[in-house]
């Protein structure tokens, strides 16, 4: 039995709220059940030094968790003086995923930074961050068009992300923390609305994942991403 009685192919309650920040050019509060991630998009009219003069823009991301986003308080990484390997891995994943659906040349020599701050964590923070980040990015490029700084949208595709796993021999969609911590295998899928693969991270804990189980996880993820993409568009429409 899954927590809250969910079916194996059921996601948690998904809520995506766009435009939650009065200052950022784009923003989205992504709620995947008990996981809440605030994503904000900020536009800078410059690019990193190594990109100057190249005629292309850049999309990057930063990720972090509030100290009490989890059951016990975690020390702020700024206080520790360095980011954890996990933080660096996740923010690179977010940026890399978003760049897969952006025409950087069409963006022009400007940078969009997506800040993903985990307010509350109950599993799937990176997938919630990617899903909310796309909404914030779309709002930001919409702002550039409204301001006359762009004539067309450089975001040429839609994507979202979801977690899956094998628990007690059963393949399940959208794991929460209690499931994730005892999963025999878990995977994160970043997919486009048309089923294109942007990134897949899959790990076996006790024994290798049979191909049949992976195929089941992939099928669950594809169905979940379709629903997430619909939620993204609904959020942008307000």
UniProtKB/Swiss-Prot annotation:
Binding site for phosphate: 86, 124-126
Classification via Pfam families: RNase_PH, RNase_PH_C
A GO term for molecular function: tRNA nucleotidyltransferase activity
Domain of life: Bacteria
Annotated catalysed reactions: tRNA(n+1) + phosphate = tRNA(n) + a ribonucleoside 5'-diphosphate
Single biological process term from Gene Ontology: tRNA processing
Enzyme Commission number(s): 2.7.7.56
InterPro entries in the cross-refs: ExoRNase_PH_dom1, ExoRNase_PH_dom2, ExoRNase_PH_dom2_sf, PNPase/RNase_PH_dom_sf, Ribosomal_Su5_D2-typ_SF, RNase_PH, RNase_PH_bac-type, RNase_PH_CS
Keywords: Nucleotidyltransferase, RNA-binding, rRNA processing, Transferase, tRNA processing, tRNA-binding
Family designation: Belongs to the RNase PH family.
Subunit organization: Homohexameric ring arranged as a trimer of dimers.
HAMAP family: RNase_PH (MF_00564)
Protein role: Phosphorolytic 3'-5' exoribonuclease that plays an important role in tRNA 3'-end maturation. Removes nucleotide residues following the 3'-CCA terminus of tRNAs; can also add nucleotides to the ends of RNA molecules by using nucleoside diphosphates as substrates, but this may not be physiologically important. Probably plays a role in initiation of 16S rRNA degradation (leading to ribosome degradation) during starvation.
UniProt protein name: Ribonuclease PH
Taxonomic lineage of the native organism: Bacteria, Pseudomonadati, Pseudomonadota, Alphaproteobacteria, Maricaulales
